[in-house]
Amino acid sequence: MGSNYIVIEGLEGAGKTTARDVVVETLEQLGIRNMIFTREPGGTQLAEKLRSLVLDIRSVGDEVITDKAEVLMFYAARVQLVETVIKPALAQGVWVIGDRHDLSTQAYQGGGRGIDQTMLATLRDAVLGDFRPDLTLYLDVTPEVGLKRARARGDLDRIEQESFDFFNRTRARYLELAAQDSRIRTIDATQPLDAVMRDIRATVTKWVQEQAA
């Protein structure tokens, strides 16, 4: 399908929206303009309804969403987006810039929730097969910094209201996974914004040039 699926990952408040803008600007400077944007969960009618269910704290009233129900909703939304939007776009040579993908589930549910990692890997492989992003930019930020930024934006969703311990476990799993996969590039998002933007530009530029070589 070509090397044109880039995903941006990170904790709440890591700066994913700013990073997306920098990625787009960098790609355009490299002559790439045929792009679409996705977010997870979401991106299709079904996936957006699932997003509301899993993130809106009021969506199911007083009913507690179990950890396994949560992860299955994420995967239902993901496979719908991948099969109906992402794969068709990639097949047509369109670049896809994604706000989150499967790494989020491996980190949040595997790290934060403590769901068995073998089960998550099996579920991922059953649902997605060998489909993976070509490049993932992981914006690394401490929960203290990230949640301070997120809370400054206003209302928090169901997952954003989790404890610092939850986000520390999530971050630890992100870092562990990033160290295991060369397709994941870690960006220090605790730096001043100019430095973060510089690192993103440099990483994307180098990667695109490597793919073209």
From Swiss-Prot:
One of its GO terms (biological process) is dTTP biosynthetic process. Its EC number is 2.7.4.9. It holds the Pfam family Thymidylate_kin. InterPro entries: P-loop_NTPase, Thymidylate_kin-like_dom, Thymidylate_kin_CS, Thymidylate_kinase. It catalyses: dTMP + ATP = dTDP + ADP. It comes from the Bacteria. Coiled coil: none annotated. It is an enzyme of class 2 (transferase). PROSITE patterns: THYMIDYLATE_KINASE. One of its GO terms (cellular component) is cytoplasm. Keywords: ATP-binding, Kinase, Nucleotide biosynthesis, Nucleotide-binding, Transferase. One of its GO terms (molecular function) is dTMP kinase activity. ATP binds at G10, L11, E12, G13, A14, G15, K16, T17. PANTHER family: THYMIDYLATE KINASE, UMP-CMP KINASE 2, MITOCHONDRIAL. NCBIfam families: DTMP_kinase. Belongs to the thymidylate kinase family. Phosphorylation of dTMP to form dTDP in both de novo and salvage pathways of dTTP synthesis. This is Thymidylate kinase. It comes from Salmonella typhimurium (strain LT2 / SGSC1412 / ATCC 700720). The lineage of its organism: Bacteria, Pseudomonadati, Pseudomonadota, Gammaproteobacteria, Enterobacterales.
